[in-house]
């Protein structure tokens, strides 16, 4: 069974078509209208070996908030749908990624209990025209809609771009690990018998 999903979401603020495959080749076709987010999603797909297609149109003439947040919502929904019943998955993923001066860690539990924790501070409020606070909004909506427990720690760094890049690379690697199928796992990886 293919572990993939397609999500469509239209509001008065955004229109998004998103396709996602867990068992991909790291290919991304991205039209987000938010150049820095496009760059980060490309890294996420490449380092997680996911295939990701996003066609988003939003009210970026106001700012990037709605588009960034809604792409996070759609990607989270796609991850949840692509996982199906979660039988055989590892469930947990952990990745440290350095990017020059920066070091980030992402830890995931695909528990069906959404939670988000973020530790770290970015030196700059913007990268180009992108509001750095939107990284938090994107990740929180992703965790909520994917129903994952997501912990993100930016241990240190001087360059905000490098720090965020390390986060998105680590996110891809941690999610790849958590979604891997382990032949030793019979059913779902929980003593409850369900996730």
From Swiss-Prot:
Top-level taxonomy:
Bacteria, Bacillati, Bacillota, Bacilli, Bacillales
- Gene Ontology molecular function, alphabetical: imidazoleglycerol-phosphate dehydratase activity
Q: What class of enzyme is it?
A: lyase
Q: Which UniProt keywords apply?
A: Amino-acid biosynthesis, Cytoplasm, Histidine biosynthesis, Lyase
Pathway, per UniProt? Answer: Amino-acid biosynthesis; L-histidine biosynthesis; L-histidine from 5-phospho-alpha-D-ribose 1-diphosphate: step 6/9
Protein name listed in UniProt: Imidazoleglycerol-phosphate dehydratase
**Native source species:** Geobacillus thermodenitrificans (strain NG80-2)
Q: Which reaction does it catalyse?
A: D-erythro-1-(imidazol-4-yl)glycerol 3-phosphate = 3-(imidazol-4-yl)-2-oxopropyl phosphate + H2O
Please state the Enzyme Commission number of this protein.
Answer: 4.2.1.19
Please give the chief subcellular localization of this protein.
cytoplasm
Compartments reported by the entry: Cytoplasm
Q: Name one GO cellular component term.
A: cytoplasm
Q: Which family does it belong to?
A: Belongs to the imidazoleglycerol-phosphate dehydratase family.
């Amino acid at each position: 069974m293919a572990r993939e999903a397609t999500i469509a979401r239209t509001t008065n603020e955004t229109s998004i078509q998103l396709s996602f495959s867990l068992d991909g080749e790291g290919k991304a076709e991205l039209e987000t209208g938010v150049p820095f987010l496009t760059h980060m999603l490309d890294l996420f797909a490449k380092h997680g070996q996911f295939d990701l297609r996003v066609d988003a149109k939003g009210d970026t003439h106001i700012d990037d908030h709605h588009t960034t947040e809604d792409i996070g919502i759609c990607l989270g929904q796609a991850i949840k749908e692509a996982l199906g019943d979660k039988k055989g998955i590892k469930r947990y993923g952990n990745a440290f990624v350095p990017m020059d001066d920066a070091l980030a860690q992402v830890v995931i539990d695909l528990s069906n209990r959404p939670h988000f924790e973020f530790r770290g501070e970015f030196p700059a409020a913007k990268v180009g025209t992108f509001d750095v606070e939107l990284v938090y909004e994107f990740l929180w909506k992703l965790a909520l809609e994917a129903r994952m427990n997501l912990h993100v720690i930016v241990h240190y760094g001087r360059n905000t771009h490098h720090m965020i890049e390390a986060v998105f690379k680590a996110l891809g690697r941690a999610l790849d690990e958590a979604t891997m199928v382990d032949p030793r796992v019979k059913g779902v990886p929980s003593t409850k018998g369900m996730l």
